[in-house]
Amino acid sequence: MGKQINIESSATHHQDNIVSVITATISSSSVVTSSSDSWSTSKRSLVQDNDSGGKRRKSNVSDDNKNPTSYRGVRMRSWGKWVSEIREPRKKSRIWLGTYPTAEMAARAHDVAALAIKGNSGFLNFPELSGLLPRPVSCSPKDIQAAATKAAEATTWHKPVIDKKLADELSHSELLSTAQSSTSSSFVFSSDTSETSSTDKESNEETVFDLPDLFTDGLMNPNDAFCLCNGTFTWQLYGEEDVGFRFEEPFNWQND
């Protein structure tokens, strides 16, 4: 009986030891698992931080350069200079437009070449400057390169118009000259008209005074009342009190 109790107690004690060992094993595995999970989490966070840092650095670089590669016909050299070129129409070759310190200068050079080769249908980096860019003498690559260099090196842009004050002065002088010419024309016309009128008047007077003499002997009618004295009549001047002349009619007794 005593032996049986000892065996049962020892078995129970052995089971307790096994349970303790199993519990300790489970606890240690849980610790290992948790530490492994924490390490994995730390690693993932570190990788994410590195990735986000790289993205931030890339975005900062893009912001600093203001995306210069968006200019058409412009690319950057490894040493920091910017080159400009354009493809010739219906050819695989390109026209070299030069190397410039900034992307904007290279872009203006490209715009000049695009206008020369493609006209108004060409794609421009600065369409607002299309009317101010220099034009090449011809469409040869040499002339295009010269005009492109001139546009790239230009620092200021002015519209090719006359100053407003000068334009007003020119307009005023043109108006004055027009008015003077109109006045001169009117004066010449009036002078010609006056001369024509005086000439017509003189010719009319000559016509009046060139009438045939109605009192000549050949044209006078003997039966006319003015011919009572054989075609003769007399005028008698009276004193100063009389106003004019008096016509002295002949008497019949004078013809006896």
From Swiss-Prot:
Pfam families: AP2
Signal peptide: none
Listed Low complexity bias regions: 33-42, 186-197
Region (Disordered): 33-72, 186-205
Superkingdom assignment: Eukaryota
Keywords recorded for this protein, A-Z: Activator, DNA-binding, Ethylene signaling pathway, Nucleus, Transcription, Transcription regulation
Annotated GO CC locations: nucleus
Single Gene Ontology BP annotation: ethylene-activated signaling pathway
Gene Ontology MF term list: DNA-binding transcription factor activity; transcription cis-regulatory region binding
Location of the protein in the cell: Nucleus
SUPFAM superfamilies, per the entry: DNA-binding domain (SSF54171)
Residue ranges for the DNA-binding region feature of this UniProt entry: 70-127
Task performed by this protein: Probably acts as a transcriptional activator. Binds to the GCC-box pathogenesis-related promoter element. May be involved in the regulation of gene expression by stress factors and by components of stress signal transduction pathways.
Name this polypeptide is given: Ethylene-responsive transcription factor ERF035
Source species of the chain: Arabidopsis thaliana
Gene: ERF035
